[in-house]
Amino acid sequence: MNERPILFFDSGIGGLTVLREVRVLIPETQFIYVADDAGFPYGNWEENVLKNHILKVFTNLLTLYNPTLCVVACNTVSTLMMADLRKEFPHTLFVGTVPAIKLAAKQTKSGFISVLATPGTVKRAYTRELINSFAGQCHVQLVGSEKLAAFAEDYLRGKPIDLEELRNEILPCFFEQNGKYTDTIVLACTHYPFLINLFREQALWPVKWIDPAKAIAKHIRSLLPERMYHKNTKKLKDFALFTSQNITSSTKHLLKEFGLNITKGVDFEM
């Protein structure tokens, strides 16, 4: 019996932060990485248009690749429509990436938390439900950046980043009141961990930056049968699919470092 792959989906290359952690736990599984970079960034899409687009894309992806599990490695999509995906495709296992607010609430000492996300994730009702459920006793600052995901894409491609602009994007995360300071910042976009060293350099004061990728990887492993992570050899190669034609040599090099061969210009809405 052929092993079914695990499929990762994101609007760009941010989902690689989750893929690399899953690979550590189940390295012999085949991974397919789908980057809908023709639609990047999702944070600027109207909700209904984005929902319809994602449903069409997944209809084709599931037909083509029949994955054992789909990782929606995009906070914007995960906070918008995980319920829709599970309802539309009831026989497919979906794992989303949502802001790690519960973990932040457990770890904060000051009670002051910031959630650094895209504008789409910030405005979602689901994000506020997480705050009400797990961080009701905390002061939670929601910060939606329109630039950081693109900065991460550029940074990984070796392009220069305007550090002053980056600093301005994260400044609202640092909040002080009555002698208490923000001590925990949730990275609520899978792109952002790629910028973590720059964030630390530009921070107003030391904070704990929470990247949920390791926790997501452990959750994914817990959902899979043991035979998937006790195999001795990898039978099928991993690969990446990009929906645009605009793939630079630096992107190809990056994906090669992740062991992913690229196919570009794939249209999953057909």
Swiss-Prot record:
- The domain of life for this entry's organism is Bacteria
Q: Name the pathway.
A: Cell wall biogenesis; peptidoglycan biosynthesis
* Enzyme nomenclature, EC number: 5.1.1.3
Q: Which InterPro entries match?
A: Asp/Glu/hydantoin_racemase, Asp/Glu_race, Asp/Glu_racemase_AS_2, Glu_race
- Quote the catalytic residue positions: 74 (proton donor/acceptor), 189 (proton donor/acceptor)
Gene3D superfamilies annotated for this entry? 3.40.50.1860
Does the record's keyword annotation contain Cell wall biogenesis/degradation? Answer: yes
State one Pfam family annotation.
Asp_Glu_race
Listed A to Z, the keywords are: Cell shape, Cell wall biogenesis/degradation, Isomerase, Peptidoglycan synthesis
Instruction: List all membrane-crossing ranges.
Output: none
The positions annotated for binding substrate are 10-11, 42-43, 75-76, 190-191
A GO molecular function held by the record:
glutamate racemase activity
Q: In which family does this protein belong, per the annotation?
A: Belongs to the aspartate/glutamate racemases family.
Tell me, in a sentence or two, what this protein's role is. Answer: Provides the (R)-glutamate required for cell wall biosynthesis.
Please identify the protein, giving its name as recorded: Glutamate racemase
Origin organism is Bartonella quintana (strain Toulouse)
Query: Could you read off the lineage of the organism from its UniProt record?
Result: Bacteria, Pseudomonadati, Pseudomonadota, Alphaproteobacteria, Hyphomicrobiales
Gene behind this protein: murI
